[in-house]
């Protein structure tokens, strides 16, 4: 199977491509795109891994999950981090707490501020 890696940093893509070639990892494709958008052109995906903490999973990424697909990430809520698994079952997304942990917040994944009365 092909592994699609999304990165917004061109230098990191270049570095990663060199490492993949040196290690004969021929099934990896690196794509420059905003992380929070994912890459719907090749979806739906059976597995999505967001490596870093986020404050919310954007719907645009959840919509890229195939039926039976899973997304794993670290969700930060109120200064507390949790490894979470999101699964698409019967066209609904179900979340499951895995364990507590912290990681740096990924750029572009801050929760959008909402107006409150």
Tell what function each PLM region has.
Residues 83-117:
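Substrate-binding/catalytic lobe of Class I Rossmann-like enzymes that use SAM or dcSAM, i.e.
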Residues 1-94:
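Conserved nucleotide-cofactor-binding alpha/beta core module
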């Amino acid at each position: 199977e092909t592994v699609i890696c999304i990165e917004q940093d061109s230098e990191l893509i270049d570095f990663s491509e060199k490492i993949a070639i040196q290690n004969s990892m021929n099934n990896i494709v690196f794509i420059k795109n905003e992380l929070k958008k994912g890459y719907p052109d090749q979806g739906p995906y059976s597995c999505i891994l967001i490596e870093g903490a986020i404050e919310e999973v954007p719907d645009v990424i959840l919509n890229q999950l195939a039926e039976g697909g899973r997304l794993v990430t670290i969700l930060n809520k109120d200064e507390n981090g949790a490894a979470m698994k999101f699964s698409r079952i019967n066209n609904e997304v179900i979340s499951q707490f895995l364990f507590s942990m912290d990681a740096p917040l990924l750029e572009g994944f801050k929760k959008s501020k909402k107006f409150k009365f």
